[in-house]
């Protein structure tokens, strides 16, 4: 079966509509960065500004993992459990409810199983249309009527952009050089790829800034060492 047929088969076992309406953030967070925490903040702001949607106060954040891609430690050095622990310990994910799933459809389906209904999905422009399409096609009312779903477009996710490895590495290294020179990095340049590369090069202070833990050096070092051991 192809991917669409697989989803169609899974659709047959979807739970009824959940009673708790949520805004959903889906990602690998490998590792979690200050960019991810900025996303959580943006989603919380959206929830506050749209009371008419009757959303839960905090976003549902689904950590993607558990599939074959986890075997590639270069891209996925931290386990799902480790990613969740680091985000909770950061103090930057207050009000967030964490879940895990192997892919986007499983994430939305799992939320329904737990009594949540995905109403808003937040993602970068590369992934957002696909997520919205899944929700609109498969996640309907119990009598088959359409549910109005909303998209929250976020700044580009560097890890989701398909570029040649050599070009991507050059861009990442250029950003890291700038970070070492002036100690600052623009939020739109932050990515999990940047954090992993900082570990590869031994840039521990820069890594702490990328992951938003420059004021929690103990936790930053623990994450740095975990990633270094896995690479």
Specify the residue positions occupied by each region the protein language model found:
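Nucleotidyltransferase catalytic core that binds NTPs
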Residues: 2-231
């Amino acid at each position: 079966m192809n991917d669409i047929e697989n989803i169609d088969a899974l659709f047959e076992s979807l739970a009824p509509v959940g009673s708790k309406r949520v805004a959903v953030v889906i990602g690998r967070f490998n590792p979690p960065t200050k960019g991810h925490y900025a996303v959580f903040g943006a989603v919380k702001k959206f929830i506050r500004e749209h009371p008419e949607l009757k959303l839960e106060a905090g976003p549902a954040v689904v950590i993607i993992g558990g599939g074959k891609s986890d075997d590639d430690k270069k891209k996925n050095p931290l386990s799902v459990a480790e990613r969740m622990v680091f985000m909770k310990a950061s103090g930057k994910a207050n009000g967030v409810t964490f879940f895990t799933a192997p892919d986007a459809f499983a994430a939305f389906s799992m939320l329904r199983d737990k009594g949540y209904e995905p109403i808003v999905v937040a993602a970068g422009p590369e992934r957002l249309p696909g997520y919205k399409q899944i929700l609109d096609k498969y996640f309907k009312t119990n009598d088959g009527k359409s549910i109005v779903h909303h998209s929250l477009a976020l700044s580009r996710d560097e890890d989701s952009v398909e570029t040649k490895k050599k070009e991507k590495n050059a861009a990442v290294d250029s950003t890291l050089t700038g970070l070492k020179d002036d100690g600052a990095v623009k939020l739109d340049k932050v990515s999990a790829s940047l954090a992993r590369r900082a570990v590869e090069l031994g840039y521990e202070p820069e890594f702490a800034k990328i992951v938003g833990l420059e004021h929690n050096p103990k936790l930053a070092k623990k994450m740095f060492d975990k990633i270094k051991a896995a690479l």
